[in-house]
Structure formats: structure tokens, C-alpha cells
A protein has these predicted regions:
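N-terminal Rossmann-like NAD(P)+-binding subdomain of aldehyde/semialdehyde dehydrogenases
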Residues: 1-113
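ALDH superfamily catalytic-core signature
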Residues: 4, 9-11, 172, 205-346, ...
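Residues at or immediately preceding the N-termini of alpha-helices
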Residues: 17, 36, 54, 239, ...
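Short, well-ordered beta-strand elements within core beta-sheets of diverse protein domains
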Residues: 26-32, 124, 232-233, 263-266, ...
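Residue-level signal for inorganic ion chemistry
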Residues: 39, 85, 146, 177, ...
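Rossmann-like NAD(P) dinucleotide-binding subdomain of oxidoreductase/dehydrogenase enzymes
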Residues: 105-241, 366
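Conserved C-terminal structural/oligomerization subdomain of aldehyde/semialdehyde dehydrogenase
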Residues: 329-332, 336-486
């Protein structure tokens, strides 16, 4: 397929973006309800492209990060995208089927259903940490729902942006799917377009900006944000296993994951044992030479590395104890650092105020499960919560008494990668959800359709009021009120 580029267009990048939006809206108006076959064809084409481009995409991500394992990119960015496309292809017929609903007894002779109608043009704003999966996941949901899609990719992943643009341009016209990257120097302008829905993944601060811009057009938004996702380790759970899994969560993509465990809550008498187990787990996974270890991901750029270093400096100056999982702290040139465990954290430190988004693991001591739950509830509602326990009583209590976007028990992150369940936040960690059927519903308009039976007595609701049938209906359904209430 041919897609125009800014070089081929005489106007500005913003004008080009607005032109594409107009084209997509016109395309949607010409075909507002793509058939099941048409939607499946698009999803099959997308899946084939992901498989074809897997090596090139993984290499592009590696180039943008300076170092990220090709296998890690394939497992986390690409495999998830293929599985999500497969899931949509397999279940789309059922999702598209109108949902029959029961009428009230009074309307029994009529038919009632909910039809799921494409919304129109969907805007997708993608973060840099998983630039492929977090572009293709919403794209799959939007195509399954029958929409047209404009994707705004992050400025700091130019190699991935170019490869995604090329991959999608081969199978989609720009009035179906269009990609924008670093040429849009004012990303806020993207959010002011009158989309029919916006999907944004990023920080709560930017999410609020997106939501304010969308409000000008009354555009509904799905916000996948972040927060400080806790990991609660119970006294009944093997400490070494919990430390291994939490450390893996902090080391994967160097902790640059919105659902990475942000901090660990550990029984106070087990802190030292947990620290040693975490250090041992890190060395087993990556050895002592992460400078030359292709399995360990770099911090994406110098600015983000400095932010992480500044957070550690702030904590140290305020009395925290910092323990690197390896014998050195930073590979400055390669922007790599081992997981750093931080003890004696206090609420005034940046490390306990900000989402860390890097290989830093504060470990907070607790006395009782009551204390741990209270600690979690004292902060904003996180995108994820992790609970390590063999007690169903403890597990159920934590699930009942805490709020989070999703939960994995006895590990981290796995609730996100199953496509038959929704992924989304709550409160400060986001609103709305996608993946699987929930993604289809999120990007569809649920339209209620009532078909009147020709013998339905609509005159029951017409004036003049006070007829025998009206009084009978009122008496039957409302019973008798309390005449003493004045």
C-alpha cells in the first residue's frame, strides 16, 4: 500500500496529520460497518506482517535502546501482539453478534438487543518502553471493532517508528491505518483532533493533559497509566522464590514497565534474607558483567538514566541504604545499571513518591498484614498489585481490601498477557480497559435497539391519563405508596 510521507506533502506536519484524519473519517463514513470477513482479513494481514518483520522490529528496538535483547523484544513485544491478533480472529464472530436482552414484563411482546457499532476514527498514543506491543495491541482492538486508526509513536524510538510505519504501510492505506512519529513536534496537537476515541498509555501527569484535550471534543478516552505497584510478601511464602520473581520484574526491560513491581513489602524480620536472595537471583540471571550482557536492557536515554540516578541520590542524602545487586552501580556509557535495592525509605523521599520506572527496588518492612494493607491503601490506586502467599485467607483479604488495575498472585505481570481478560487501571492508574473482548467493547458503541411488536399497547403510555389499564399497571407494578409522606 502507498502511504504519503511529510516529504511528499507540501504543508506542515500538523496539516498533514489533519489531512489524514479527514481521509480516515471519509473512509469510515463510506464503510461504517466493515463485515466480519473484512475485519478478519485486516487482522490476518497484520499478524503476517508482525511475523515477517519480527527480526527487523527487534533490531530496531535494540537500536533505539542501545541494548535490548532481541529475544526479549520478540517475547514481550511481538509474541504478545501475535497472540492478541489470534485471539481476536478466533472470537470476533461472537463479539460482533448482537446481544439479545430481556425486556421488562410490561414490554414482553417486544424485542430488545445491543448492537456493537464501530466508533469511527481512533487515536492511539504510544509510550517508548514497549513501542511495538503498545501500538499493536490497541490497533488490534480497534480493527476488530471496525474502526480506522491513527497512531502517534514516541519521539525517542525513531528506528522502531520507521520500521512500524513501513510494516503497516505495506498492508494498510493511510485512510485505514496511519502512523506518526517524531515529525509531530507538538504531540498535544494530536490529542486535539476530534477522534471518536483515544487510547493513551503513559504517565498519570500526561494522561491528565490528554483527558483535558479530549474533553474539548467530548472524546471518550482509555487511559493506561502507571503508579507504584506493590509486591506483598507473606510470612508463609518461600522468601527466595518471592525475591527471585520480584527481582525478575525489576530487571526485565530494566524495570521500564508500567506493571513492574515498584516496591516490596517484606516481613521486618526477613529483610536481610530477602536482600541476599534478590542479589543472588540477579547474579544467576545476568552474571557479574552486565556491561557486555546482551540479555540486559539499557535505560532508554541519558535523561532517564539521570532521573534514576537523581532518585537514588535523593534517597541516599535522606538516609536510605542503597545496595546494588552487583559489585558496581552503573555502566554509564551503556546506560546499564543492576537492580538497586533500597532500605530505610521514608515518605519524603522521591523514591516513595514517584513511579520509579527503572531498576530500583525499595524494600519496606512491615509488622502485620494489617500494616501492609494499610500501607498500600495510603497511596494512589496502582496499575498492578502482586501478592506472594499460600494462604487463601490472606489472598482473598488482599483482593477484597485493596484496589488495583489487576493482580498476579505468586508472581508478577502475568495477568496482563492473557488476552481473554481486560487490562486497565483504576483511579490514578487509568480508566477503561482493552485486550480481548473488553478491547472490542471499549472501542465499539453499545447501541440499544428496541423493536416494537405491532400489538404492543403503546396507548397505555399516552394521555389522557387515568384510564383503567393505566391504573391497573400502576397498581400492579408500584403497589401502594405511603400517603403520610407529604
Amino acid at each position: 500500500m502507498e502511504q504519503s510521507t511529510l516529504k511528499e506533502y507540501s504543508g506542515s506536519a500538523t496539516e498533514h496529520m489533519e489531512l489524514i484524519f479527514s481521509k480516515q473519517r471519509a473512509n469510515f463514513e463510506a464503510d461504517p460497518y466493515p463485515s466480519l470477513e473484512a475485519r478478519r482479513t485486516k487482522l490476518h494481514q497484520l499478524k503476517k506482517q508482525i511475523i515477517r518483520y519480527q527480526d527487523a522490529l527487534a533490531a530496531a528496538i535494540n537500536a533505539d535502546f542501545s541494548s535490548r535483547s532481541l529475544d526479549e523484544s520478540k517475547l514481550l513485544d511481538l509474541l504478545g501482539s501475535v497472540l492478541e491478533a489470534d485471539h481476536a480472529i478466533h472470537h470476533l464472530r461472537r463479539w460482533m453478534r448482537p446481544s439479545k436482552r430481556r425486556t421488562e414484563l410490561l414490554f414482553l411482546s417486544n424485542r430488545l438487543s445491543v448492537q456493537y457499532q464501530p466508533k469511527g476514527v481512533v487515536g492511539v498514543i504510544v509510550p517508548w518502553n514497549f513501542p511495538v506491543y503498545l501500538a499493536l495491541g490497541p490497533l488490534i482492538a480497534a480493527l476488530a471493532a471496525g474502526n480506522r486508526v491513527m497512531i502517534k509513536l514516541p519521539e525517542i524510538t525513531p528506528n522502531t517508528n520507521a520500521m512500524l510505519r513501513r510494516m503497516l504501510a505495506e498492508v494498510f492505506n493511510e485512510d485505514e491505518v496511519a502512523v506518526f512519529g517524531e515529525e509531530i513536534t507538538d504531540p498535544a496537537r494530536f490529542t486535539t483532533l476530534p477522534f471518536n476515541h483515544i487510547v493513551f498509555t503513559g504517565s498519570p501527569a500526561i494522561g491528565k493533559v490528554v483527558m483535558r484535550a479530549a474533553a474539548e471534543n467530548l472524546t471518550p478516552v482509555t487511559l493506561e497509566l502507571g503508579g507504584k505497584s506493590p509486591a506483598i510478601v507473606s510470612r508463609n511464602y518461600p522468601l527466595a522464590d518471592a525475591a527471585k520473581r520480584i527481582t525478575h520484574g525489576k530487571a526485565t526491560n530494566s524495570g521500564q514497565i508500567c506493571v513492574a513491581p515498584d516496591y516490596a513489602l517484606v516481613p521486618k524480620e526477613s529483610i536481610d534474607e530477602f536482600v541476599e536472595a534478590a542479589k543472588s537471583s540477579f547474579i544467576k540471571m545476568f552474571g557479574h558483567d552486565i556491561e557486555n550482557n546482551e540479555n540486559y536492557t539499557s535505560i532508554v536515554n541519558d535523561r532517564h538514566l539521570k532521573r534514576i540516578q537523581d532518585i537514588l541520590t535523593d534517597a541516599q542524602e535522606k538516609g536510605a541504604l542503597i545496595i546494588p545487586c552487583d559489585t558496581y552501580s552503573f555502566d554509564q556509557q551503556g546506560r546499564r545499571m543492576p537492580v538497586h535495592i533500597v532500605l530505610n525509605c521514608t515518605p519524603d523521599m522521591r523514591i516513595m513518591k514517584e513511579e520509579l520506572f527503572g531498576p530500583i527496588l525499595p524494600v519496606v518492612a512491615y509488622d502485620s498484614l494489617d500494616d501492609a494493607i494499610t500501607y498500600v491503601k495510603s497511596d494512589e490506586r496502582p496499575l498492578a498489585l502482586y501478592c506472594f502467599t499460600h494462604s487463601s485467607i490472606e489472598r482473598d483479604r488482599i483482593l477484597r481490601e485493596t484496589h488495583s488495575g489487576g493482580v498476579t498472585i505468586n508472581d508478577w505481570g502475568w495477568h496482563v498477557v492473557n488476552h481473554d481478560a481486560p487490562f486497565g487501571g483504576i483511579g490514578n492508574s487509568g480508566m477503561g480497559s482493552y485486550h480481548g473482548e473488553e478491547g472490542f467493547r471499549e472501542l465499539s458503541h453499545a447501541k440499544t435497539v428496541f423493536i416494537r411488536h405491532r400489538f404492543f399497547p403503546t396507548q397505555l403510555f399516552h394521555p389522557p391519563y387515568g384510564t383503567f389499564l393505566q391504573k391497573l399497571a400502576i397498581r400492579f407494578f408500584l403497589k401502594k405508596g405511603d400517603p403520610s409522606i407529604k
